[in-house]
Structures are given as C-alpha cells and as structure tokens.
Amino acid sequence: MKPQRPQRNTLCTQKEFPLKDITERIISCAIEVHSILGPGLLENVYEEALSHEFKLRDILYERQKEITLKYKGKVVGKHRIDFMIEDKVIVELKAVEVINKIYEAQLLTYLRATNKRIGLLINFNVDLLKKGIKRLIN
C-alpha cells in the first residue's frame, strides 16, 4: 500500500512533515509582518518586510533566486522564486484575493525543478494570515 502524504495545514510529526522547524520559523516571520502591515498592500512590500524579518532572526535566505526549468535535458526557461530559505524551503508570496490552483501548481513546479521537498505559499491579502498559508510537499 502506498504511504499517504499528510494533508496541508495539519499538525504532523517531523517524520510526516519534514523541515517542520524551519517552516514554523518562516511562518512566524510572515505572521509578524502581517500583524504589523496588515492586508491590502502590494506583494513587493511584503517581500521587502519579510526579507528584513529574516535578517533580524538570522534566517539564511536567497531572494528572487533564479531557477532553471528543463525539458528532457534542454533548458526551456528561467524563473525567479521569491525566497529560498536555507537552501531547503521555497517560499512564494502573493497578495491576491484568492489563491488559485495555478499558484499551487507553479510552486510544485519550482519544487520539482529545484529538487526541494517543501514549499510555502503565503497570501498576505487575508484578515488572518493563517488562512493564507499553504504548505506543499513535493
């Protein structure tokens, strides 16, 4: 029988949900930013504030990291991810009314392209940030 993947946004053990500690630290930073700035701003404002919060908390990150997309060994495109945290977790930010499935698909593509396991999709345009966070597992 194939093992079940944990559902998104549920409490899981470290074995079920890898990199739980770092993702919780990232989410804590995002909650801090959201609690001060609130919803309704442009994505780049949240990106700048979150970058500053990562620095304050000594979290290693790369911002607007370029990744390469390949098809059968041929480079077919390049994209930029909002944040790569400690070379382990991809964080994509949004400031939209609704998180569409295409944003989730995009993050999963980035996870596959970089061979990373965990991604966070964070939408700051919500009243309670907890409602705007999705954890995706590759």
Which residues does each predicted region cover?
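Intrinsic disorder/low-complexity segments
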Residues: 1-21
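A short, surface-exposed helix-loop junction/capping segment
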Residues: 26-36
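Conserved catalytic cores of phosphodiester-cleaving nucleases, focusing on short active-site segments
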Residues: 38, 83-99, 110
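A short acidic/basic microdomain associated with nuclease active sites
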Residues: 55-70
